[in-house]
Amino acid sequence: MAVAYADKPNHFINFPLTQFEGFVLNYKGLQFQLLDEGVDCKIQTAPHISLAMLDIQPEDYRSVDVAIQEVIDDMHWGEGFQIKFDNPHILGRCIVLDVKGVEELHDDLVNYIRDKGCVADQSRKWIGHCTIAQLTDAALSIKENVDFINSMQFNYKITINPSSPARLEIVKLGAEKKDGFYETIVSHWMGSRFEYNPPTDKLAMIMGYCCSEVVRKELEEGDLPENDDDAWFKLSYHYENNSWFFRHVYRKVLISVSLVNLDCNCLGFYESPVEED
């Protein structure tokens, strides 16, 4: 089957950087150097990494949202990982930094989003970068500007772990910027779901169940939509969007859903034969 590419993207997966104060201080230092040198350019006011380009419609938001959560839930943190920024240079009309350390995250996002049937990534090879500024055509044609940009130095590392302020977001191309961030459709803190204790008593009560019928009995009447798919989706969003539910309940459901209307073990409060990941 041919792979569909987002060569005419309308959204992207964003990794914002404004919340990393040390990085931003050095990043703005580069921008000041450009302005001080008189380079005619438009400064980027929302530093970020574009991790994957998307060609999606509003009806795809839910699928991409869930894919992002699954990527976060499946991360093997260990001691975390580092993102390295260096080598200021010109890419097209932009002045950018090379970004290393997020290649695996990019691949995971693309694969998980494609598994949901959505179009992600472009036919050209993805290159991790962080835009500093965009040059005007006139500035790009001035040799002194090019030489100055090529002489600039930058080297900075950010460590990402479950307690860092890292986020993954769905952003529409052309979205407004405010206070260093893009307006987002979805934004998830990468560490917010790295928690193996039930976030609420109610989720603790239903954690071993594999079908919506028993879950409905534990919740208040009308808490869940009548449609099972919609019910599971709402549960995954319950209580401040904590995806703990995905790890401990939802994946069992994907396997045992065919048994829901037959002989569900939950009705007898037996342990599910399906092993957890």
From Swiss-Prot:
It comes from Bovine coronavirus (strain Quebec) (BCoV). Belongs to the coronaviruses ns2a protein family. Signal peptide: none annotated. Pfam families: Corona_NS2A. It comes from the Viruses. This is Non-structural protein 2a.
